[in-house]
Amino acid sequence: MAKISEDAHQITGLTPYVPETMPKANTYKLTNKRNPAYQKNVVYFSTCANRAFRQNQGYDDTRSLQQVFESLCDKAGYNVIYPPHIENLCCGLSFENYEEIDKQALADLTEALTKASEGGVYPIVIDHSACFNHAFKHIKGLKILDISEFLYTILPNLNVTKCNESVIVH
């Protein structure tokens, strides 16, 4: 695909170039993960970009971000709850310059997060910092956490094996 798009781009100057490193579509289905033995719950709002794409090719771990998050929550003893109709939800940041669309996106997200968190009983994790910031500024009355903040809080519940490898933190 990359070679074809590059050749077409060079010939016509009109066709977009699709690089080899372009992330592939994320086909992972988001469903609640509940274990009756777990007493703790977390609402996970996976953002538009992270729902649309999986990680770049070339990594040993081919799981989606959602699968990794679910795995860490499982190891820490947390049930994972997705907001209803997550595929239609957006924090509104992309529409910030379109006030009515931004307000509607935030209203829809607030309603879904309120329902999923049972009125704010459970913490809500957002997996993209810019989207977290936008939601955090505009949604009141719910405990909204950036994914890194939540992972820091569950770290004591995880058995972490040190490794001598390079890791990427984004």
Feature-to-residue mapping (PLM):
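Iron-sulfur cluster-binding electron-transfer modules in prokaryotic oxidoreductases
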Residues: M1-H170
